């Protein structure tokens, strides 16, 4: 069975939970009240019907602020949500083709790669060889170089064309 009671370490340090001999206190309007005892700071906070919240315990002495804790907690959660929204992980999208690709098909692949790059993703351009086609790796290298040239306005080559088994690949990343 899981113990549902939270330890005091997990709880936020507010009001009576602040256990330091002296703290630096900042008022709700941003002015400093100086270095006082937690009991005195708590009395000031209660007079204003607000909470005493520990902002930085690493400072010497620890810094506390008089504020509405519910509002503070809401703002912190809101900031975390915004940060999560803005966070974009660059995925690696793959564009596969053969070295004997037709012109229209090549243009479709270039447009596809361009879309991926504009979305902020990296692109792995892969050319697959079958059977004896591997003898024509120079043509595949030329095709990848052409693709890099066609995409130079939106991408930069992160990894030059190189052979890996029966494939030749090149990595492109979006320009900053």
UniProtKB/Swiss-Prot annotation:
Function: IF-3 binds to the 30S ribosomal subunit and shifts the equilibrium between 70S ribosomes and their 50S and 30S subunits in favor of the free subunits, thus enhancing the availability of 30S subunits on which protein synthesis initiation begins.
Principal subcellular localisation of the protein: cytoplasm
Underlying gene: infC
UniProt KW Protein biosynthesis keyword: yes
Database matches in NCBIfam families: infC (TIGR00168)
Classification via HAMAP family: IF_3 (MF_00080)
A GO cellular-component term linked to this record: membrane
GO molecular function terms listed in the Swiss-Prot or TrEMBL record: ribosome binding; translation initiation factor activity
Swiss-Prot/TrEMBL GO biological process terms: ribosome disassembly
Cellular location(s): Cytoplasm
Name used for this protein in its record: Translation initiation factor IF-3
Subunit structure: Monomer.
InterPro entries reported for this sequence: T_IF-3_C_sf, T_IF-3_N_sf, Translation_initiation_fac3_CS, Translation_initiation_fac_3, Translation_initiation_fac_3_C, Translation_initiation_fac_3_N
Coiled coil residues, start to end: none
Natural source organism: Microcystis aeruginosa (strain NIES-843 / IAM M-2473)
The UniProt record lists the keyword Cytoplasm: yes
This protein's UniProt keywords: Cytoplasm, Initiation factor, Protein biosynthesis
Domain of life from the UniProt record: Bacteria
């Amino acid at each position: 069975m899981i113990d549902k009671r939270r330890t005091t370490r997990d709880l936020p340090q507010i009001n009576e939970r602040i256990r330091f001999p002296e703290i630096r206190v900042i008022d709700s309007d941003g002015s400093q009240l100086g270095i006082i005892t937690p009991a005195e700071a708590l009395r000031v906070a209660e007079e204003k019907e607000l909470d005493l919240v520990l902002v930085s315990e690493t400072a010497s002495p620890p810094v506390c602020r008089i504020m509405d804790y519910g509002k503070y907690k809401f703002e912190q959660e809101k900031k975390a949500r915004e940060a999560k929204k803005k966070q974009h992980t660059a995925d690696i999208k793959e564009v596969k083709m053969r070295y004997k690709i037709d012109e229209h098909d090549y243009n479709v692949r270039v447009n596809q790669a361009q879309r991926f790059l504009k979305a902020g993703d990296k692109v792995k351009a892969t050319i697959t060889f079958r059977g004896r086609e591997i003898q024509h790796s120079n043509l595949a290298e030329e095709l990848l170089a052409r693709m890099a040239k066609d995409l130079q306005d939106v991408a930069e080559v992160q990894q030059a064309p190189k052979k890996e088994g029966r494939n030749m690949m090149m990595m492109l990343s979006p320009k900053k």
